[in-house]
Structures are given as structure tokens and as C-alpha cells.
Amino acid sequence: MAKDDVIEVEGTIVETLPNAMFKVELENGHTVLAHVSGKIRMHFIRILPGDKVTVELSPYDLTRGRITYRYK
């Protein structure tokens, strides 16, 4: 999948799940299941409920995504 095909949206972490998975509520009200990208994992950036994040969604499955950025 090319990088151009992803949909980037902003949301808020609602719940922390096992294996670095999170429930994220998007700005449009939808809830998606998202995992942490490799760069965030590599730099030990902690993500807690209530944090504002950027999520990449695949056009093929809009219920799952990848967290690519945590706002300060």
C-alpha cells in the first residue's frame, strides 16, 4: 500500500488495550481500534487516555488505524 492511500484524521484516546492497542474516538464521532507506529514505539513515547493523536486509516478497513503522532 502506497503512503498516498492513507487517510489522516485526529482523535482522542478513549481506552488503553493490551499489546499497544488503543480505542480512539475520532473528531467525527466514530471509534476506531489503533496500534502504535514503529517510530513512536522506538522512541518510548507514552500514550495515555485523553491524549490527542493523529491516526492513519487505510481506505480498505476504516475501523482500524495506526497512531503516527501524539500532540503535546
Swiss-Prot record:
Using the UniProt record, give the first listed, main subcellular location.
Answer: cytoplasm
Q: Where is the S1-like domain?
A: 2-72
Q: Which InterPro entries match?
A: NA-bd_OB-fold, RNA-binding_domain_S1_IF1, S1_domain, TIF_IF1
**Molecular function per GO:** ribosome binding; rRNA binding; translation initiation factor activity
Q: Where in the cell is it found?
A: Cytoplasm
Family of the protein in this entry: Belongs to the IF-1 family.
Subunit structure of this chain's protein: Component of the 30S ribosomal translation pre-initiation complex which assembles on the 30S ribosome in the order IF-2 and IF-3, IF-1 and N-formylmethionyl-tRNA(fMet); mRNA recruitment can occur at any time during PIC assembly.
The protein in question is named: Translation initiation factor IF-1
Q: Which classification does the entry list for the species?
A: Bacteria, Bacillati, Bacillota, Bacilli, Bacillales
Gene encoding the protein = infA
